């Protein structure tokens, strides 16, 4: 199967997953509450969220523009950074506009299919972002442990294939979400206690059995995060081992500094994400509005901070 036919297959699978004709019952629209318990303060909460979204848009578009326009930045590190910026734009834009509309003007209704599309883009591209962080760790490993062969190992063809694998993984893992959700029967109460269509928030509204949905969602989350964090950890273990062999403190600090921006981005992405995931799944005593706020911030804070981190930590981007 060639690349074109494979992507055609993926597209057909996605269309089938979203198609109403495959299922017996028409599905209702949903109503997004926003931040339950903080309805009176939602206008004020929307202000910092809007600023974060604006920072994400300006910062990531700027990163993409700089890398596109400067041929000297067409290297593996910056090409992976451009992938990260593009993904951050999608993640932020798939949630923020609707969330802000809910908080500011009470535009709470969202169609069933639109809800699924929003959820698909949010979760699929978050998975892709995790994959790009693994690719960036691989790039740092090759740059530090095999510096003389860096350009031959990670040439543009290899970078393109890595990007394709990251994209396909995100799509393949999330298409079953849509298929499983389409099989659920929803009760009359279609009110989502959230500001956007989050997977578990939608699953909890179903009247039918949701064990498979819950199990698959948990499996995908643990699989993606577990394997990706393991890969990043192994890469940095080798990097640390190589750097400690470098003679002289100044040379070691210089080697470590090349990884500084990537380490910051990893921490910004995984720590809030894991905290949000664990509190949503297992933090039954945590107030619901805290769950929602954490989930919204997780979709906006990394896209807003990543360009700032790379601007400060990377000399070429700063210049």
From Swiss-Prot:
Odorant receptor. Residues 65-72, 139-157, 236-255, 313-319 are cytoplasmic. This is Putative olfactory receptor 52L2. Disulfide bonds join 115-207. PROSITE patterns: G_PROTEIN_RECEP_F1_1, G_PROTEIN_RECEP_F1_2. Its main location: membrane. It is a multi-pass membrane protein. GO terms for molecular function: G protein-coupled receptor activity; olfactory receptor activity. It is found in: Cell membrane. Glycans are attached at residue 20.
């Amino acid at each position: 199967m060639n690349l074109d036919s494979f992507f055609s297959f993926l597209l057909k699978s996605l269309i089938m997953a979203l198609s109403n004709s495959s299922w017996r019952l028409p599905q209702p629209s949903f109503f997004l509450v926003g931040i339950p318990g903080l309805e009176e303060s939602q206008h004020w909460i929307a202000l910092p969220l809007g600023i974060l979204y604006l920072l994400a848009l300006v910062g990531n578009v700027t990163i993409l523009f700089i890398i596109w326009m400067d041929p000297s930045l067409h290297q593996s590190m910056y090409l992976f950074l451009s992938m990260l910026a593009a993904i951050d734009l999608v993640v932020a834009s798939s949630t923020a506009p609707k969330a802000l509309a809910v908080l500011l003007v009470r535009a709470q209704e969202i169609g069933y299919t639109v809800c699924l599309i929003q959820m698909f883009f949010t979760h699929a591209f978050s998975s892709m972002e995790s994959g790009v962080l693994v690719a960036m760790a691989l790039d740092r490993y090759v740059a530090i442990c095999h510096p003389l062969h860096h350009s031959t190992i990670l040439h543009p063809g290899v970078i393109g294939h890595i990007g394709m694998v990251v994209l396909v993984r995100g799509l393949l893992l999330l298409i079953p979400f849509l298929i499983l959700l389409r099989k659920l029967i929803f009760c009359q109460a279609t009110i989502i206690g959230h500001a956007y269509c989050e997977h578990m928030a939608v699953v909890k509204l179903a009247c039918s059995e949701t064990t498979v949905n819950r199990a698959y969602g948990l499996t995908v989350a643990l699989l993606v995060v577990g394997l990706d964090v393991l890969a990043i950890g192994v890469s940095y273990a080798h990097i640390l081992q190589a750097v400690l062999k470098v003679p002289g403190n100044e040379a070691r600090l210089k080697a470590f500094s090349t990884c500084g921006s990537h380490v910051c981005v990893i921490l910004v992405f995984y720590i809030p994400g894991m905290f949000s995931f664990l509190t949503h799944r297992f933090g039954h005593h945590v107030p619901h509005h805290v769950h929602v706020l954490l989930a919204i911030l997780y979709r906006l804070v990394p896209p807003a901070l990543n360009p700032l981190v790379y601007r400060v930590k990377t000399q070429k981007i700063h210049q």
